[in-house]
Amino acid sequence: DFPLQDGKQAEFLELLGGALPDTRAFDGCLKVETFAEEDGKSVLLVEEWESKKHQETYFQWRVETGLVDALAPFVSGPPVTRYYEIRSE
């Protein structure tokens, strides 16, 4: 969940949208969905990975390649990352 600065959601989504094809092609990525809060104050990414290790390797790659720094001017605070286990009921 990325908290955003006022009026920055469209620009954030544009930059993020350009990066998502590489995310979806990254080893271990099964799915990524983007949700934009109606009031423009946040964007939520819901990702499914083969393992937590795959996601951590991907995130480190995004740090090294500069995407994390490129997103920084749009956010109002640190992103919130949560890990969930998919459960079948």
At which residue positions do the language-model features occur?
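Short phosphate-engaging motifs
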Residues: 8, 41, 54
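Short beta-strand micro-motifs enriched in acidic
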Residues: 35-37
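Short aromatic/hydrophobic contact patches that present stacked aromatics
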Residues: 1-3, 44-46
